[in-house]
Amino acid sequence: MARPKNVKYVFVTGGVVSSLGKGILSASLGMLLKSRGLRVAIQKYDPYINVDPGTMSPYQHGEVYVTDDGAETDLDLGHYERFLNESTSQASNLTMGRVYKSVIDKERRGAYLGGTVQVVPHVIDEIKDRLAELAKNGNYDVIITEIGGTIGDIESLPFLEAMRQMKLDMGDRNLLNIHLTFVPYIRAASELKTKPTQHSVKMLLETGIQPDILVCRSEKPLSSEIKRKVGHFCNVNNLDVIGLNDCDTIYEVPLTLLQEQLDLRVLKKLGLKKFKEPDLVYWREFCNKVKHPTSGEVTIVVCGKYTEYPDAYKSILEAFIHAGASNDVKVHVRLIGAEAAENEAYDFARELEGVHGILVAPGFGDRGIEGKVAFIRYAREQGIPFFGICLGMQCASVEFARNVCNLAEANSTEFNKRARYPVIDLMEQQKKVKEKGGTMRLGSYPCIIKEGTKANEVYGKFLINERHRHRFEFNNAYRETFEEHGMVFSGTSPNGELVEIIEIKDHPWFVAVQFHPELKSRVQAVHPLFHGFVGAAKSYAAVGHQPELAAIEPHFMPEPTAEAYAAYSEESSAESKSFFPDNGGHDEERDSGQ
């Protein structure tokens, strides 16, 4: 493995239990190093055999995070983007399935010259080569790699072996391991217990890896005595035992780690001396707004299909935190399963009392669709601010067709292939697609916004780029009928063929989009649609009439370049060729609970 000069590597592992927050830790460290002037790349290694999480159920994996270049990735990449305010890519997520697939493909091509293909060296070398490629293709000072899973899992062993070999080759000054562990608080004894951490480090040592820094998650702050004890039994300097007790919000984690001097310990161990003091004024102000808003609170319902597992809507929930801060309000989110509203006895007035906005979330498959349509109808008829995303836009189109355009049998061909009025239909270029994984319309595409619309008002521009993940689209055969009944098609593809945004003008806020705006909302760049929607809910809570949008800084959505616009404008009318040629996807099989 040829390593570019001067690139330093940080690997983040986890022990004791899963879900300790390795992604938040990695993102926080990346943000702190970036704030000191370093160029940081961050990536996630997942040990599962799936090529990507695109075909995995939301109940098992949570949200699938889509990047600009059309990669379907782990939700931790969302944390990376939100904390670092930088876009990730296909290179930012590597699964063991992708590694094995690459090795097997090479073997079939005869790349190993008749040799016996083994985990060592071939699989390990593939992992190391992927990391070297990332370093070579970017101008980075530090590359942070989060290894998914928990120490002791058999699936993670190849990644750990690759890290061990790299550290042996590069030396301690070029690669370090941060191990995240759990120090439980036993209430009966009023004590923090370090034994689980000791055993976790012992298991890591069995792989040949001595952790350089320990970050200890705990309910209570770690005393200096506890840190000395952990350091003594884990063969780590007590200065390298970092306490990370529970925070009120994940956005306080970087501030806690800064206070614990994690970034300084990393810089010292890697021999990085040229850096500046971090400027975290904006970050502190943001956390203060999240914890102590001064303009009241709003309650927003998220109607979805996977509401038992909030991680399925991770980016939506985080976008509401950003939009709450930008509107100086506390946003309370209530997750409601769409199937509940399919019961004729469902009392919307009682169940939605005190609700100031309704968001109908993305999803796949026909389960709960009629419930989503019912929620949309209630929001439209009662003048409650409404926001639909992806499937939410498609359901809004079905509802409008049935109850406003008098097309009672309107539906999407995803749910009824013989629908009398197929207002939502499979995209033309998808009709010959047979494979599920890696075949949807994925990644960033442009959208032209119509002047004088709500979309134009919140974006403050006419050309935007947004991320997509879908196969079905609005059927243009019904555009004229919809417009005659008051629907505004406020955003389309540059060639005008694909509907991207719809809205109703005589409504406080009724906006639905085919793309996924939640994937581009960040701490330092709140998404304008979420900002506008929460602003509408805030006004609805106060006076119940047409909202006045709160002011927002104009820097949050970078303008596409003229070259990008020209490239998109030259697409065919069917838009069959993606700007990113390696896009992929899948659909309804993820809804394992249909």
Curated annotation (Swiss-Prot):
The keyword Glycosyltransferase does not apply. GO terms for molecular function: ATP binding; CTP synthase activity; glutaminase activity; identical protein binding; metal ion binding. ATP binds at residues 19-24, 76. Belongs to the CTP synthase family. UTP binds at residues 18, 193-198, 229. L-glutamine binds at residues 59, 363, 391-394, 414, 471. It holds the Pfam family CTP_synth_N. Pathway: Pyrimidine metabolism; CTP biosynthesis via de novo pathway; CTP from UDP: step 2/2. Residues 562-571 have a biased composition (Low complexity). CDD domains: CTPS_N, GATase1_CTP_Synthase. CTP binds at residues 18, 153-155, 193-198, 229. GO terms for biological process: 'de novo' CTP biosynthetic process; pyrimidine nucleobase biosynthetic process. It comes from Chlorobium phaeovibrioides (strain DSM 265 / 1930) (Prosthecochloris vibrioformis (strain DSM 265)). The keyword Magnesium applies. The gene is pyrG. It comes from the Bacteria. It catalyses: UTP + L-glutamine + ATP + H2O = CTP + L-glutamate + ADP + phosphate + 2 H(+); L-glutamine + H2O = L-glutamate + NH4(+); UTP + NH4(+) + ATP = CTP + ADP + phosphate + 2 H(+). Residues 562-594 are annotated as: Disordered. This is CTP synthase. Signal peptide: none annotated. The active site is at 390 (nucleophile), 516, 518.
